[in-house]
């Protein structure tokens, strides 16, 4: 059996608002590129970014906890006009953050 991947901790937030702007723009671009550009993609990216920023401002640095918070709060979002759902959004945020840190999404190695 493979060894479990250790938890991934983000560096402490020095500018959560700036991180949020980056995440919002990057997630919106990812959503538009993954399937079709849709008007709702901007709303999805804004909401996920809002949750992320709030969590970071509260001191959350654990990637798994951030993803669960986004997943949980995105369950209340109306995805009826989108190809996506809360799981796809939470996973995309995780992938984008891992990419930004230079961490291999497959195996957790830098």
Where are these regions (language model features)?
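Intrinsically disordered, low-complexity regions
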Residues: 5-7, 28, 49, 54, ...
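Amphipathic alpha-helical binding modules
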Residues: 73-110
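Amphipathic alpha-helical interaction modules
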Residues: 25-70
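Amphipathic alpha-helical protein-protein interaction segments
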Residues: 13-16, 60-64, 82-86
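Protein-protein interaction and targeting regions used for scaffolding, dimerization, and localization
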Residues: 8, 12, 58-61, 77
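Amphipathic alpha-helical segments in structured regions that serve as interaction surfaces
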Residues: 19, 44-48, 70, 92-97
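Short terminal alpha-helical segments
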Residues: 1-38
């Amino acid at each position: 059996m493979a060894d479990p991947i250790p938890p991934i901790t983000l560096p402490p937030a020095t500018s959560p608002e700036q991180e949020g702007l980056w995440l919002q723009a990057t997630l919106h671009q990812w959503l538009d590129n993954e399937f079709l550009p849709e008007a709702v993609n901007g709303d999805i990216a804004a909401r996920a970014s809002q949750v992320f920023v709030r969590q970071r401002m509260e001191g959350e640095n654990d990637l798994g906890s951030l993803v669960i918070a986004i997943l949980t709060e995105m369950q209340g979002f109306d995805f009826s006009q989108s190809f996506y759902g809360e799981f796809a959004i939470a996973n995309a945020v995780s992938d984008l953050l891992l990419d930004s840190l230079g961490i291999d999404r497959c195996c957790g190695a830098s």
